């Protein structure tokens, strides 16, 4: 673990540091190891404070805070979702996060989480699919080839062995980008001209679109028996990707029902519609995939424990790397009750420095 020589100093992981860390570890290794942390925290689900994320909605998008604690550590993520940003040359999702010590309340880590969120989302999807997808699934359709598509592909390759991709996006340039970025990664890739073509022969269907709308990306006639659906695009009220008939045919698995009923595909269904919780599958309390013809649906919206897992993982991986800055973030007077005195002493220091003769 990193040492903090002064209590005012908090390790800060910039975007540059995060990219260097991911590349040093290796993207697929990073995803596999991160998935291990995610699964570990789902196994101790009962230890966590859980609440739906705190959201501020506007017609342009949403800004959210995602907090949780296991009683020893506290973590939160600030994240936005603004689908229109792509038209303005901006990311649809940006994020940063904090990990803190519950005992003192002092932050232990401040880090970028735009890249890290894409990695943790993909790792979580692959963890769910490990328990829900057909045995020996090798072919995945990805509907929506934007910023998260490559991460999803690489996570499913690293954790499930998926090596055949069928890609579709309304924007052919997005598909071309995805193919270009995954060259040499060990995939057999087919660019498709429609959703119907993309899902043909797929064991797993991933939907990861960005539009903030009740869209119907996938209709019931496109989904055959035995398929696992990884529905990633839903993350706020009023944003869906699947036709309701698909939900009624599927066994639905969610992260945290109170949040998913607001933001996920199941917002289309009655509030008491039965769903299964992913942590119960991972811990063996309930069965995941029961037979070869079962349609399983992971209604993923992202939950705070996954960000907590990602923050823990990054904290642990930073040891001896030097891939962080020492950020002077916290006021730490010698006498904890004398915060104003600290300000006065600094004023004197500035005055003495200003009267020093120039060298």
UniProtKB/Swiss-Prot annotation:
Class in the EC hierarchy, top level: lyase
Pathway note: Amino-acid biosynthesis; L-proline biosynthesis; L-proline from L-ornithine: step 1/1
Question: Which GO biological process categories is it annotated with?
Answer: arginine metabolic process; L-proline biosynthetic process
**Record keywords, A-Z:** Arginine metabolism, Lyase, NAD
Which reaction is the catalytic activity of this chain? L-ornithine = L-proline + NH4(+)
Q: Which residues form the active site?
A: 235
What are the binding positions for L-ornithine in this chain?
53, 77, 120, 235, 301
For this protein, the Enzyme Commission number is 4.3.1.12
Record's protein name: Ornithine cyclodeaminase
Instruction: Supply the source organism for this entry.
Output: Brucella abortus biovar 1 (strain 9-941)
Lineage per the UniProt record: Bacteria, Pseudomonadati, Pseudomonadota, Alphaproteobacteria, Hyphomicrobiales
Q: Which gene encodes it?
A: ocd
């Amino acid at each position: 673990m990193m040492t903090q020589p002064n209590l005012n100093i908090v390790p800060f992981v910039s975007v540059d540091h995060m990219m260097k860390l991911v590349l040093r570890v290796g993207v697929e290794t990073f995803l596999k190891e991160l998935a291990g942390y995610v699964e570990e925290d789902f196994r101790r689900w009962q230890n966590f404070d859980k609440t739906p994320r705190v959201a501020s909605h506007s017609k342009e998008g949403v800004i959210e805070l995602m907090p949780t604690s296991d009683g020893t550590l506290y973590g939160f993520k600030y994240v936005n979702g603004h689908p229109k940003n792509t038209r303005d040359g901006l990311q649809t999702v940006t994020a940063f996060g904090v990990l803190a010590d519950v005992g003192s309340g002092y932050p232990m880590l401040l880090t970028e989480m735009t890249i890290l969120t894409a990695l943790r989302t993909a790792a979580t999807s692959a963890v769910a699919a490990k328990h829900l997808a057909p045995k020996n699934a090798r072919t995945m359709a990805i509907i929506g080839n934007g910023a998260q598509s490559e991460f999803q592909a690489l996570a499913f390759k690293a954790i499930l062995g998926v090596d055949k991709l069928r890609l579709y996006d309304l924007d052919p340039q997005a598909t071309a980008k995805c193919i270009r970025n995954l060259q040499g990664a060990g995939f057999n890739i087919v660019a498709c001209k429609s959703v119907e073509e993309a899902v043909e022969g797929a064991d797993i269907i991933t939907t990861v679109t960005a539009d903030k709308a009740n869209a119907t990306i996938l209709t019931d006639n496109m989904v055959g028996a035995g398929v696992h659906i990884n529905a990633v695009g839903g993350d706020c009220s009023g944003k869906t990707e699947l036709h309701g008939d698909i939900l009624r045919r599927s066994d639905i698995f969610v992260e945290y029902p109170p949040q998913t009923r607001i933001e996920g595909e199941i917002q289309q269904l009655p509030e008491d519609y039965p769903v299964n919780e992913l942590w119960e599958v991972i811990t063996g309390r309930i069965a995941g995939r029961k037979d070869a013809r079962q349609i399983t649906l992971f209604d993923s919206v992202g939950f705070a424990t996954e960000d907590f897992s990602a923050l823990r993982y990054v904290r642990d991986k930073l040891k001896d790397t030097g891939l962080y800055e020492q950020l002077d973030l916290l006021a730490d007077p010698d006498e904890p009750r004398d915060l104003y005195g600290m300000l006065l002493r600094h004023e004197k220091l500035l005055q003495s420095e200003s009267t020093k003769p120039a060298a």
